[in-house]
Regions:
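Short beta-strand elements
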Residues: 280-286
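Switch/coupling subdomain of P-loop NTPase systems
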Residues: 287-326
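Glycine-rich phosphate/pyrophosphate-binding loops
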Residues: 327-335
Length: 393
């Protein structure tokens, strides 16, 4: 077993992380699951290019609660780490393995991590963290432990299956994160569209009866994994793959309490000069414009970031609903706040142009239908849209 000090630029970074880095402690789960997703996508990429001589299979991420031990477990079946990689990526705060991986493999789409601090968000809710990991390479597993001080222990582990398990020993002031309802709520808030299946417990599923079943036959119930996320949401698909019913179903998935159908949708899909995907809906407003609920949601590589999209979406389009997903929108280190730059202005101008184009096509194709919808869409000034449409990017 080896011991050492975590390489940080201050004597103890953990109180700073807990107090200043993240505005909301609950996002630790988003960060840890994002890391697990990264590890799995890295393995997929390496197997695709022949660098990893292992079977990718159908990996998933599992989240488990152990109330008796007061622990929360996040388990992936991804790339794993060797002891040397744990030293490099875990013990050097702010050195991001995902960022280095992207630089080495420019075509590795979907890698989320940027700052290398996400793992340490665990210490916002845990007074001890364990990491047990086995690399896809033929090397021994490693077991890293830290109690929130700069000191850590690193020893061999008897783990035989590929991947990483993170064990959070939940602190007394964070016991709510040992409640199933709370973890379920957070998973659905931040991770419901992540690209890797996420298992949280099990559920009962009823099998259909065979055609020749007796009249008094009872259907069989089986226990299956409770997968909480949709790994292929509508905005990740090509418009040619989707029907109007698919778009409506996605709207209902985003806003289950909205009973009115949207008036129209706009599918965003750009890869130059910036990356932007998403689907925006123009809701039926009626006489009640409530801009505080059911807002546009911002994602980065299918990870929810915020629904505060001021700056990306112009003020006069904030009544739209839907999803925007872009890795090119700069965020602060905690991924909580937008940082305005040239890319954001270009994306904002593009969104405005797409809305203007859609409204123009509605007038051209079916003016009568457009006039019927006027009471709902007049809140967006057509003149205002056209003025913004002239912005160049």
């Amino acid at each position: 077993m080896s011991k050492g000090n975590i390489n940080v630029s201050v004597e103890n970074i953990f109180p700073l992380i807990k107090k200043f880095l993240y505005s909301d402690h609950e996002i630790f789960l988003r960060e840890l699951i994002s890391n697990a997703s990264d590890a799995t996508l890295k393995l997929k990429h390496l197997t695709n290019i022949g660098e990893a001589k292992v079977e990718y299979g159908n990996p998933k991420i599992e989240v488990k609660i152990n109330k008796e031990d007061k622990t929360l477990h996040i388990i992936d079946q991804g790339i794993g780490m060797t002891a040397d990689e744990v030293e490099k990526y875990i013990n050097q705060v702010a050195f991001s393995g995902a960022e280095e991986f992207i630089n080495q493999h420019k075509d590795a789409d979907g890698i989320i991590g940027h700052f290398g601090l996400g793992f340490y968000s665990a210490f916002m809710v845990a007074d001890k963290v364990e990491l047990i990991t086995k690399s896809y390479k033929d090397e021994p597993a490693a077991h890293w432990t830290c109690d929130g001080s700069p000191e850590f222990t690193l020893e061999k582990a008897d783990k035989t299956d590929r991947g990483t398990e993170i064990i959070l020993h939940i602190a007394e002031d964070s016991k709510e994160f040992l409640e199933e309802w709370k973890i379920n709520e957070l998973l659905h808030k931040y991770n419901k569209f992540m690209p890797i299946p996420i298992k949280f417990g099990t559920k009962k599923e009823t099998l259909p009866l065979p055609e020749d079943a007796a009249e008094d036959a009872k259907p069989e119930e089986i226990e299956v994994d409770n997968i909480i996320n949709n790994t292929q949401p509508a905005w990740t698909k090509s418009p040619s793959e989707l029907t109007d019913e698919d778009y409506l179903a996605f709207y209902r998935e985003l806003y289950p309490m909205q009973f009115e159908e949207p008036l129209f949708h706009i599918h965003l899909n750009v890869d130059y000069p910036f990356n932007l995907t998403g689907i925006l809906f123009f809701p039926k407003l009626g006489n009640n414009i409530n801009l505080d609920k059911d807002r546009i949601q911002l994602y980065q590589n299918q990870v929810f970031v915020t629904d505060e999209v001021n700056g990306i979406v112009p003020d006069f389009l904030m009544l739209l609903r839907g999803v925007i997903d872009s890795p090119d929108i700069p965020l602060n280190v905690s991924r909580s706040y937008l940082q305005a730059d040239g890319a954001v202005k270009k994306i904002s101008a593009h969104i405005t142009k797409k809305v203007a184009d859609k409204m123009s096509s509605l007038i051209t194709q079916n003016r009568e239908d457009y006039e019927k919808k006027w009471n709902d869409i007049k809140a967006v000034s057509y003149t205002h849209l056209r003025a913004h449409e002239t912005l160049r990017y």
